[in-house]
Structure formats: C-alpha cells, structure tokens
Regions:
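N-terminal pre-catalytic segment of deacetylase/amide-hydrolase enzymes
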Residues: 1-55
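Short, electropositive alpha-helical surface patch
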Residues: 173-191
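Metal-dependent polysaccharide deacetylase catalytic core of the NodB/CE4 family, i.e.
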Residues: 1-7, 53-56, 65, 70, ...
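Conserved beta-strand segments of alpha/beta enzyme cores
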Residues: 33, 114, 188-189
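Conserved beta-strand termini and adjacent loop/short-helix elements that scaffold enzyme active sites
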Residues: 37-40, 85-87, 118, 193
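Acidic, His- and aromatic-enriched active-site or binding-groove loops in soluble protein domains
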Residues: 60, 110, 187-194
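Short, acidic/glycine-rich phosphate-metal binding loop used to engage nucleotide
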Residues: 40, 61-63
Length: 194
C-alpha cells in the first residue's frame, strides 16, 4: 500500500522503503522477474517472450503518493515493474497523501507501472465496503451502481494515463458474487488479498 522513510510510521499497510529494497533484493537474488497485469492476462511478456517461470506481480493498493516519491525510484533502480491500484475519486478530489494525475502520467511513462482499478468512489462506506452490496439494495440497483463506478474508474485511468485497464483489485479483499459478471466483462485479471 504505502511506503515511508520513518520506521515509526510503519503500520499493517505501510512499510519502510528499506523494507521494499530488501523485498526487491530477495526477489532478484532468487531469480524472480516482475511482470505487469496485462502481461499476465496475455500469457506473455511485451516482447512476445513467454512468461518467466518465476514471474511475480508487485501490487500497491490505493494510490498513495509514496508510490511515486519513494517506490518509483527503487523500481527504476531495479528495473522492477508494479501494478498500482487506484481509487480514482481520491485523485480527482486531490486528496492529501494520494497520487496526482501528473504523477500517474510520469509513472505510466516509466514503463514500469501499470494502473489497475480499485473502484472510483465506493471504497469504504458505512453500509458497504469496496464492491459489497448495501443493505437492502436490489440486484438491479447494485449492478447499476457498481457498473457506473467501475466504468468511471476505467475511463479516468485511460483518459489521464493513456493506459488500458486490464486489472481490478478488490478493496479490502471483499468479494461480491453479484459483481462477478460485471468484473469479468470489464477486466482480464482480478486480485484479492489484504
């Protein structure tokens, strides 16, 4: 999720940048190769080569500014790739601590970062988290709401970065059976985990 220079700021979702460096050293030293979601979906690397036997995805959720200020320089140093799952409303609103579209564009130009959807605006609410149904919500209302949210996220990412969106990351790892047909229609790859 998030990165820091200050060990006192480490949480369940924030690691030190030196911790990321150790992780990247670990992967490199054991022969792992980072890939992007679109490469996973295609079953091959961009140059047409088959996926490496030790392919691995690095994923950073939410779109914190530290993905740009701290993680991107390390990705460049190691030649490592990562997927950054964006909550696009936070960027549109200029929420403090989150990426800006200018930063996203620079990350996209690096060729090392691919953006995934992490919803537009339905990340955490009182009656539902992520893409969960709201209490008493009909299936039709749910599908209309979630389709609009996900399509908005895809549109914002494509418009601002020029990247197609092939992946979705479930917020908080919360899945919803009603969402599956929509997700299958919109995305080639989905991720879950906390």
């Amino acid at each position: 999720h998030n990165f820091t220079d200050d060990p006192a700021q480490v949480t369940d979702y924030t690691i030190t940048i030196s911790g990321l460096r150790r992780d990247l050293d670990f992967l490199r030293d054991r022969g792992y190769v980072t890939i992007l979601p679109h490469e996973l979906a295609a079953g091959q690397l961009d140059d047409g080569a088959p996926l490496p036997q030790k392919a691995v995805l690095l994923t950073f959720d939410d779109g914190y500014v530290s993905n740009f200020t701290l993680a991107l320089p390390l990705l460049r140093e190691y030649g490592a790739k990562a997927a950054v799952s964006l909550i696009t409303a936070r960027i549109d609103e200029g929420t403090s601590g989150f990426l800006s579209w200018d930063e996203c564009r620079e990350m996209a130009k690096s060729g090392l970062v691919e953006f995934a959807s992490h919803t537009h605006d339905h990340h955490i609410h009182n009656d539902a988290n992520g893409i969960e149904r709201r209490n008493g919500e009909s299936e039709d209302d749910y599908l209309t709401r979630i389709s609009y949210d996900l399509e908005t996220s895809i549109t914002r990412i494509k418009l601002e970065t020029g990247q197609p969106v092939t992946a979705f990351t479930y917020p908080l790892g919360k899945m919803e059976p009603w969402a599956e047909p929509v997700l299958q229609q919109l995305f080639s790859v989905t991720f879950s985990g906390v």
